[in-house]
């Protein structure tokens, strides 16, 4: 059976945790930042976890994670 290819874009975006979840970076922090409050930007800097409903899709993209 051939190897399954890892989706490279997903490999750069998600990191697997020891408990089996996936860490991800928050969006909305690339441009148009002047209208966003400092508090909002500060909270967006922190990592977040992938939701349970989306975890199946991430696992399919990262077969060896």
Swiss-Prot record:
It comes from Histophilus somni (strain 2336). It comes from the Bacteria. One of its GO terms (biological process) is translation. Residues 1-26 are annotated as: Disordered. The gene is rpmI. InterPro entries: Ribosomal_bL35, Ribosomal_bL35-like, Ribosomal_bL35_CS, Ribosomal_bL35_sf. GO terms for cellular component: cytosolic large ribosomal subunit. SUPFAM superfamilies: L35p-like (SSF143034). One of its GO terms (molecular function) is structural constituent of ribosome. Keywords: Ribonucleoprotein, Ribosomal protein. PANTHER family: 54S RIBOSOMAL PROTEIN BL35M, LARGE RIBOSOMAL SUBUNIT PROTEIN BL35M. Residues 10-26 have a biased composition (Basic residues). Belongs to the bacterial ribosomal protein bL35 family. NCBIfam families: rpmI_bact. This is Large ribosomal subunit protein bL35.
